[in-house]
Amino acid sequence: MTTYAIGDLQGCQTQLNDLLQKIDAVAPQAQLVFVGDIVNRGPRSLATLRQVRALGQRARIVLGNHDLNLLAIACGLRKPHASDTVDDIMAADDRDELIDWLRHQPLALARDNHLFVHAGVLPQWSAAQTVALSREVEAVLQGPDWVAFLQKMYGNEPSLWDDSLQGDDRLRCIVNALTRIRFCQADGRMDFKAVESLAHTPAGLMPWFDAPDRRSTDTTVVFGHWSTLGLMVLPNVIGLDTGCVWGGQLTAMNLTDRTTIQVKCPQHQKPGKN
């Protein structure tokens, strides 16, 4: 079965429609995996969320940082930023149903020797461990104490993974790796300030996928999140955030032959707003 991985949508539903039409023209039965950030910053977050959910068993998603931010806004823990575009979801009649569906989605997904995450994987983690750690977060996010979890989810520390981490620190570190990481130090310590392209990598840092002794190199990690990176295709790394909401393109990749389908996008946000 053909599978297409699709980059960050961020509420760009018109481009999602165009992309799905192009996919259906060549592979109408293809499975779809969205690498997170379904909503926010684009003009049609509600319609995008509804459409992805309506794809049913044909599609899977992993949660991105903007999706988690939506959950926090929905339960009153965070106020929308000026650049957030989720008011349509907050006012929707089916808001609670959509939020409940969203919080039951995974943060990591393994399929056919591919590991799907939104942002990245720490070098200490194998693919199997990444999925297992994701399940720890999902168990809380899908449980009765999910709002309390979101209250404690935000923060940059601990920025270095240790298997002995417990409780909120452990879950926060997992979430930050799977949904926020771009650069890290050689030991895997995460940096949350740098958002540059590889050509402007800050001294002492490296992209997470170049960290030495990365344990997930035996599988292909498929991710989004990093719009300044653009389309990145390496033997065991595929980056698919091609800046749709910033005026770039929305990208889908056939994971069998690595051919791409792209749709040009208007600029809905100006660079400089992460």
From Swiss-Prot:
Q: What is its EC number?
A: 3.6.1.41
Keywords, A to Z? Hydrolase
A single GO molecular-function term is: bis(5'-nucleosyl)-tetraphosphatase (symmetrical) activity
Q: Does the keyword Hydrolase apply?
A: yes
SUPFAM superfamilies in the cross-refs? Metallo-dependent phosphatases
Listed under catalytic activity are: P(1),P(4)-bis(5'-adenosyl) tetraphosphate + H2O = 2 ADP + 2 H(+)
**Broad enzyme group:** hydrolase
Tell whether Hydrolase is among the UniProt keywords. Answer: yes
Q: Record's family?
A: Belongs to the Ap4A hydrolase family.
Function of the protein: Hydrolyzes diadenosine 5',5'''-P1,P4-tetraphosphate to yield ADP.
Protein name per its UniProtKB record: Bis(5'-nucleosyl)-tetraphosphatase, symmetrical
Name the species this protein comes from: Janthinobacterium sp. (strain Marseille) (Minibacterium massiliensis)
Give the lineage.
Bacteria, Pseudomonadati, Pseudomonadota, Betaproteobacteria, Burkholderiales
